[in-house]
Amino acid sequence: MKQVFPNDWQEILADELEKTYYHTLRQFIANEYSTQTIYPPMQDVMNAFYTTAYQDVKVIILGQDPYHGPNQAHGLSFSVKPGIPHPPSLRNMLQELQDDLGCPIPQDGTLTKWAEQGVMLLNTVLTVRAGQANSHKDQGWEQFTDAVIDKLAAREEPLIFVLWGKPAQRKKQLICKHATPHVILEAPHPSPLSAYRGFFGSKPYSKINQQLVEWDKRPIDWCLA
């Protein structure tokens, strides 16, 4: 079987990579990249897995589909490439980070530092056509990322799942069917449409760190600037 991941995700997802739907999805994606402008760049699609190995995951922040503007998406949910203006949801996340932990708002909205510490930044759909939000919905990505969530929730070691907004919160059933007492943090989505309905003031970053300390795990250094 082709090596998709350079770490333990390869073994964890080996069965999934052999399933018919995944081969169909790969063909669809290959065709889209050859005929359309697709984000993120093909080499970045699996970045969430490359950057955070299965065994290293402590926290999962679930997003929806990638940013669909030029040079924004690079395979980590909510994150943008260096030098790119902060999209509104990310701007609100960084504002809450400042309010919660006093972290200065960084110039770059690149969240790789979080991912390298065990915060998996996973979108439920991993590709998108330029300028067309949700254009790769229902092509197979959801089945793949549901399997990822299921594999994470199956771990004996508890994790923290961060579910912002209704689509993310619908994944709760995948998490709760497992016996492991995972912690689920729910809040409205940080988008401008809902941030003032309870995302601001939800203090996710300090709550995550308090929980990690309770579990005798190293807290996340959230500050980016």
Swiss-Prot record:
Active site as annotated: D65
Catalyzed reaction equations: Hydrolyzes single-stranded DNA or mismatched double-stranded DNA and polynucleotides, releasing free uracil
Gene Ontology CC entries for this record: cytoplasm
Family matches, as Gene3D superfamilies: Uracil-DNA glycosylase-like domain
Coiled-coil blocks: none
Cellular location(s): Cytoplasm
Location, primary (coarse class): cytoplasm
GO molecular function annotation: uracil DNA N-glycosylase activity
Origin: domain of life: Bacteria
EC category: hydrolase
Biological process terms in GO annotation: base-excision repair, AP site formation via deaminated base removal
EC number(s) stated in the UniProt entry for this protein: 3.2.2.27
Keywords: Cytoplasm, DNA damage, DNA repair, Hydrolase
Protein role: Excises uracil residues from the DNA which can arise as a result of misincorporation of dUMP residues by DNA polymerase or due to deamination of cytosine.
Similarity-based family: Belongs to the uracil-DNA glycosylase (UDG) superfamily. UNG family.
PANTHER family per UniProt: URACIL-DNA GLYCOSYLASE
Name of the protein in its database record: Uracil-DNA glycosylase
Species lineage: Bacteria, Bacillati, Bacillota, Bacilli, Bacillales
